[in-house]
Design a protein with these regions (language model features):
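Gly/Ala-rich beta-loop-alpha elbow adjacent to hydrolase catalytic centers
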Residues: 4
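Patatin-like phospholipase
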Residues: 1, 9-218
């Protein structure tokens, strides 16, 4: 879900280096228009308060105006994710999005997708509240974090024997662990920075921190 939907798609198609390059080189200007920067800063301030209710009115206002433009994010997906390659990869891929305004979850894996709608599924799962909803079929979808920001239980339902969950301590709904023996979690040792601020220097710091946090976990 959220940015994890994009990370996971790149990893599932075998492009770990491309995923790292994305984080080490991408800034807000590469993904968002000048007109949307003010609203992004509002999101950063309110998500940092860790309150879903604080976002409600601004999300409503953004969506009434069409939502934050996601065309640059879609362009990145089109340039970097090969639908056929992803679907044929031996690594499975799953995502969650939430239908808007019904707030009903869509949980899908590669077996549920086609080459024509793979990118729609990835973008839908990454469409943070306040972004333009992504259309799949006859429904509009937003970030799956509105339903489950760390879907370890869904992976157990899907048949995984063990789940290693990378936690971000950020936006979204977190459900209780269903099986503590099968689910292990890695938490960041320090704050990661604002959720909607893409900055190469911060990203490189977080990648290094994630490496050491994982090594301690192992």
């Amino acid at each position: 879900v959220s940015i994890g939907a994009i990370n996971a798609a790149l990893l599932a198609q075998g492009d770990c280096e491309k995923a790292a390059e994305f984080w080490e080189t991408t800034a807000n200007d590469d993904l968002f228009s000048e007109e949307d920067k003010g609203f992004l800063e509002i999101i950063n301030r309110q998500v940092n308060l860790n309150t879903l209710s604080a976002l409600k009115e601004n999300i409503k206002a953004a969506l009434e105006n069409g939502g934050i433009d996601t065309s640059k994010i879609r362009a990145f997906l089109e340039q970097n994710i090969d639908p056929q390659r992803l679907l044929e990869s031996p690594i499975d891929y799953g995502m969650i999005a939430v239908a808007f305004p019904e707030l009903q979850p869509l949980i899908a894996y590669k077996k549920d997708m086609t080459p024509e709608n793979v990118l729609d599924h990835v973008l839908a799962s990454a469409s943070f509240p306040g972004f333009q909803p992504t259309v799949i079929g006859d429904k509009k979808y937003l970030d799956g974090g509105l339903y489950d920001a760390c879907p370890y239980n869904e992976l157990l339902d899907y048949g995984c024997d063990e789940v290693i969950a990378i936690r971000l301590n950020g936006f979204g709904i977190i459900h209780p662990l269903r099986d503590k023996q099968k689910i292990r979690q890695i938490f960041p040792s320090e704050q990661l920075g604002p959720v909607m601020r893409f900055d190469p220097a911060t990203s490189r710091r977080n990648i290094q921190m994630g490496y050491y946090d994982t090594m301690r976990f192992m």
